Amino acid sequence: MLKGENAAQEQLLAEVDRFARVNSMRAKMDLKFEDNSFAEFGVAEKYKTADGEVVVQRPGKILLKVQIPIIKTDVAQMTSDGEKFRVAILEDGGTGKYKKFVLGTNSADYTALQKEVDKIENGEAQALKQNVNAFANMRPQHFTEAMLLRPVDTAANVYVQSEIFQEEFDINAKQKSPLRWVLRGYYLLDEISKQADGTMKISRRFWFDRVGGIRLARQQIFDASGDVESDIVYGREGDLTENGDYKKLPLRIEVTRPKEKYKMSLTYQDPTGVSIGKTYPQAAFLLENLWNLPEVNLDEKLREMKTKQTQAEVEKSPTPNNK
């Protein structure tokens, strides 16, 4: 068992708020994408890694550009203004028929729509999954809370501290060492919020690595049902910006979205080149369809699907016999 440091809850809360000091950021990043929705098909090779440029700003605003490395061709661009999102799929690795401009609402649940896509059984299923799903399922807002942590709110929430030990692989141990598997201790800090009906719900869980100090290593965000919405892992720490004013912040962030079945890691290409604290105009977070791509409004698609389902149920329901 690795030796762990002790910390009171106040120190853990302060560490979350230290991360939350970042109000805006602009950075160039290396992106690595893993699409698990159709594991048997995999992902088009050139989309596994990409260059990215990201701009984030509170509250919940983000611009993300994804480019093919070396040739710097835009694969996708996406924005969210905190309420709505827009995704332009600019490259599909094929004929271009999967290029789209997708619009939707941050708070909406499009799981039902995704299930309809998953029912595809014709020859286009593989091409669709390889070339479109990787970016069509990405939502820019998935990355805002990973990069811009919300500060704690002790007036509105209850925070509960506990500890946990996990068996982990020690990459620093010698290859034949019997100590390659170690027990690492973590503090868990659960954020519990009171609902309108009086029930309590977990909204976030923070994991703090206790080995060699206290380090925020992971953030889990839960939905209204208590299921994991985002699982965010923070890598090794370093200093950001040219002057190094923002110290001991993660240089790599990994975001896993279980419902959308994908994982994205973001690594700063040049930590000293990161810009923090500037204010960006609202227009920067409102992507326009300058490419005249076919538009797909997910809210409209969802309404259409629900209407069809309702009509189908009515048609299937038995009618009383005429007397």
What would you call each of these model-derived segments?
Residues 31-85, 91-93, 287-289, 296, ...:
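Post-signal peptide N-terminal segment of secreted/secretory-pathway proteins
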Residues 138-154:
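Solvent-exposed helix/loop surface patches that form functional interfaces
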Residues 57-142:
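An acidic-aromatic
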Residues 115-127, 167-180, 195-197, 300, ...:
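Intrinsically disordered, low-complexity segments enriched in small/polar residues
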Residues 43-49, 73-77, 95-102, 200-203, ...:
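Short, mixed charged/polar active-site loops
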